[in-house]
């Protein structure tokens, strides 16, 4: 039995999230259907992180166990032949039994691309979030500072969250303006359900001047979801990368898959 890891990219707007559902319109369902068509046997995948409806994947990772002997490029090309244009396997790699797509990961990174312009752009539909009013980047950065570290993030989890604990370690929040865009990067050991979108909602509320920067600290320590801002739209959210120990030599996601992914290539 061989353990195979795959790097997956997908357009989340085309699916009802990652996790398999009875109607079959999820990324997992499409991937496992394609693997079954190629391998001529059912293969069950384990994913690094389940994404919600509308959330995109740039650096998603899965693994599965198989008795089949196939070359790495064969897993890539063969599986892609049965996938829709909205999903693609980027790489395949045999892994030791100790590797686990979810439990071996020590960090996850998400990007959010926000288009700031008086008029929305149809060309960016589902690819970037949109807001029509200018945002105070310095105020958002000041507010974000209180979130760094290990905290109880109950105020930013959804009612459907199945995580055993609301305590997560947020390593980094970067906010970079670029033309008509503001780019956000969130890096943590793990994220709660809707956590990034709820953080985005609060940061945007501060950026619009609805609340002072200190308000976000009050929300964090209040641990009450009702005190936070509404959940922000999923359109501009990307699972950018999953971090693993170097011993596994997991390939890095393909840079430049979307124009704004290169914003972070220098850091």
Swiss-Prot record:
Its EC number is 5.4.99.12. SUPFAM superfamilies: Pseudouridine synthase (SSF55120). The keyword tRNA processing applies. CDD domains: PseudoU_synth_EcTruA. One of its GO terms (molecular function) is RNA binding. Gene3D superfamilies: Pseudouridine synthase I, catalytic domain, C-terminal subdomain, Pseudouridine synthase I, catalytic domain, N-terminal subdomain. It holds the Pfam family PseudoU_synth_1. Substrate binds at residue 110. NCBIfam families: hisT_truA. Formation of pseudouridine at positions 38, 39 and 40 in the anticodon stem and loop of transfer RNAs. PANTHER family: PSEUDOURIDYLATE SYNTHASE, TRNA PSEUDOURIDINE SYNTHASE-LIKE 1. This is tRNA pseudouridine synthase A. It comes from Paraburkholderia phymatum (strain DSM 17167 / CIP 108236 / LMG 21445 / STM815) (Burkholderia phymatum). The gene is truA.
């Amino acid at each position: 039995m061989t353990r195979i890891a795959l790097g997956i990219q997908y357009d989340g707007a085309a699916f009802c999230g990652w996790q398999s559902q009875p109607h079959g319109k999820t990324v997992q369902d499409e991937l496992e259907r394609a693997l079954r068509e190629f391998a001529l046997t059912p293969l069950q995948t384990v994913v690094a992180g389940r994404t919600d409806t509308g959330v995109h994947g740039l650096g998603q990772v899965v693994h599965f166990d198989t008795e089949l002997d196939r070359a790495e490029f064969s897993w890539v090309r063969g599986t892609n032949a049965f996938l829709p244009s909205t999903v693609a396997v980027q790489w395949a790699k045999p892994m030791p039994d100790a590797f686990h797509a979810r439990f071996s990961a020590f960090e996850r990174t998400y990007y959010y691309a926000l288009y700031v312009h008086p008029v929305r752009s149809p060309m960016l539909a589902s690819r970037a979030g949109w807001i029509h009013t200018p945002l105070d980047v310095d105020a958002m950065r000041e507010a974000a500072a209180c979130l760094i570290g290990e905290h109880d993030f109950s105020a930013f989890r959804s009612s459907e969250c199945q995580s055993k604990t609301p305590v997560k370690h947020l390593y980094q929040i970067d906010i970079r303006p670029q033309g008509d865009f503001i780019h956000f990067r969130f890096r943590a050991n793990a994220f709660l359900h809707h956590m990034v979108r709820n953080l985005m909602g609060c940061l945007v509320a501060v950026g619009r001047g609805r609340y002072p920067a200190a308000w976000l600290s009050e929300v964090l320590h209040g641990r009450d979801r009702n005190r936070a801002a509404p959940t922000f739209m999923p359109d501009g959210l990307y699972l950018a990368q999953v971090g693993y120990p170097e011993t596994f030599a997991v390939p890095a996601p393909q840079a430049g898959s979307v124009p704004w992914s290169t914003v972070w290539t220098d850091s």
